[in-house]
Amino acid sequence: MESRGKSASSPKPDTKVPQATAEAKATPAADGKAPLTKPVKKDTQAEKQEQAAAPGPAATKKTPAKADPVLLNNHSNLKPAPTVPAAPSSPDATSEPKGPGDGAEEDESNTGGRGPWPCENLTPLLVAGGVAVATIALILGVAFLARKK
């Protein structure tokens, strides 16, 4: 069952099988026995077909490498910020003062660049601590119940 699963999931084991058969057929010919010309030709044709098929996937593998590294390294769930032109098109847009109803205070509070919780690095520690406390509580509870019986 495992060999079927592996061959169905990846084509690499299939490409190695004809090479192994070609080596097995070539060794009897090297031992001094009569060489079989027809199977060798079939093997070489199969190898040529494999080599012809190999550049196709290699070309498709090169296209993801051309992707923008900034996009590949972006692991945040936040949407990208809209790009703002360096020079505004109209001077009236920049001269408008922001009042209390315009959300000026909200914009100033978000300039720190922090997420919803400033101590994001403590999250794994808190999870591990919670697991440890739960484990201790479970052990003590089982020990207490076993002692009562």
From Swiss-Prot:
Main location: membrane
Hydrolase listed as a keyword: no
Domain of life of the organism encoding this protein: Eukaryota
Biased composition (Basic and acidic residues): 40-50
Assembly and oligomerization: Homodimer. Interacts with AHI1.
Chain's role: Involved in neuronal differentiation.
Protein name (database record): Cell cycle exit and neuronal differentiation protein 1
Species: Mus musculus
Lineage: Eukaryota, Metazoa, Chordata, Craniata, Vertebrata
